[in-house]
């Protein structure tokens, strides 16, 4: 009943999810780790938004903070998270629990640790279905389990529902995890590096499956990854994160063909497919800053070969490049010297 308050408007342009000025910190013996810093973005119904960046940039924390799946050491310091216009940050845990799985659902990195090794996959799927439809029993429940297994591409579900997770390959286990995530017909699916534990050929199959399900069910998806190749395969829009902040946001075409932030340039140049026959892969010098004590000004300045004096003094605002494209770099200020991007002026295929 609680989820009815979040019924989709039917308008494909309506903002299903809107995050504004979100900051999340972890409180540790070493100090306060500012994992997510003043992040804002939106997600439309049926859209795939990829959040990309290096390990430790805050992308997984951002993803888990929306359905309130962070550990006790984490705290939301500021910001709002609205679904269909209603702020969910003030909801109690009991109310949030009703929304998990039905409004939003999560697919985690490692399918083996996400599944119960002592239960058959059919029993685990049935348990997930009954959380959201407790009155569903017998043949109807069995039919729903088989339907979910078919949806994620598991052949011969009648035979395989009686198997245990260890009988399945990594790719098939991830399909089971995805089926469990879809059991409550969620409006938003969070996929936190869902292909990291899989080999390359299986990764491609799972990415294609995610895209196929999104198109079939109209599920909005937030896809967290450090793999730009995966982003190119599935994303409609891309948010590039660095040191707890979104530094560039745009359509996949904006980011791949017209990147504006020097960090995005570095990420794209490091892709083997874009090395243009050079004997050495491009690397970004230095290390990301500590988020216990973020530097003054632009956090990327010390690694940025195009850094201006102001980068070390003042944090750049988010500059608007077009209706769909935004980047936080002083190079976009009208007073900045003109820099020709080292990448992005041609189609990369």
Regions found by a protein language model. Name each.
Residues 75-87:
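Conserved ABC transporter NBD signature motif
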Residues 155-161, 249-349:
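Short catalytic/signature loops enriched in Gly
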Residues 183-187:
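A short, proline-enriched helix->beta-strand linker immediately N-terminal to the Walker B motif
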Residues 86-87, 139-159, 268-269:
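Conserved ABC ATPase "signature" region
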Residues 68, 190, 194, 198-279:
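P-loop NTP-binding/switch modules centered on Walker-like glycine-rich loops
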Residues 52-53:
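The feature captures the beta-strand-to-loop junction immediately N-terminal to the Walker
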């Amino acid at each position: 009943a609680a989820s009815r308050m979040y019924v989709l408007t039917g308008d494909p342009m309506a903002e299903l999810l809107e995050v504004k000025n979100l900051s999340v910190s972890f409180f540790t013996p070493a100090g306060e780790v500012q994992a997510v810093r003043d992040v804002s973005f939106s997600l439309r119904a049926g859209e795939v938004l990829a959040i990309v960046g290096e390990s430790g940039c805050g992308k997984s924390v951002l993803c888990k903070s929306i359905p309130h799946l962070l550990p006790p050491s984490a705290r939301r310091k500021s910001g709002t998270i609205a679904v269909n216009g209603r702020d969910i940050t003030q909801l109690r845990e009991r109310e949030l629990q009703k929304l998990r799985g039905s409004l939003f659902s999560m697919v985690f990195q490692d399918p083996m640790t996400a599944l119960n090794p002592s239960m058959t996959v059919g029993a685990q799927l049935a348990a997930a279905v009954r959380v959201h439809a407790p009155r569903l029993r017998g043949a109807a429940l069995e039919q729903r389990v088989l339907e979910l297994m078919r949806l994620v591409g598991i052949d011969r579900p009648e035979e395989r529902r009686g198997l245990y997770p260890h009988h399945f390959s990594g790719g098939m286990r991830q399909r089971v995890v995805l089926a469990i995530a879809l059991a409550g017909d969620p409006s938003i699916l969070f996929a936190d590096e869902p292909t990291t534990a899989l080999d390359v050929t299986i990764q491609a199959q799972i990415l294609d499956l995610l895209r196929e399900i999104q198109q079939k069910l109209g599920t909005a998806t937030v896809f967290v990854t450090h793999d730009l190749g995966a982003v190119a395969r599935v994303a409609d829009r891309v948010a590039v994160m660095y040191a707890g902040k979104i530094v560039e946001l745009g359509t996949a075409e904006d980011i791949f063909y017209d990147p504006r932030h020097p960090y995005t340039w570095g990420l794209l140049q490091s892709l083997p497919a874009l090395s243009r026959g050079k004997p050495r892969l491009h690397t970004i010098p230095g290390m990301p800053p500590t988020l216990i004590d973020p530097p003054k000004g632009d956090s990327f300045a010390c690694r940025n070969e195009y850094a201006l004096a102001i980068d070390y003094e003042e944090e750049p605002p988010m500059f608007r490049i077009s209706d769909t494209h935004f980047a936080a770099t002083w190079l976009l200020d009208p007073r900045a010297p003109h820099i020709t991007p080292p990448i992005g002026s041609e189609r990369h295929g």
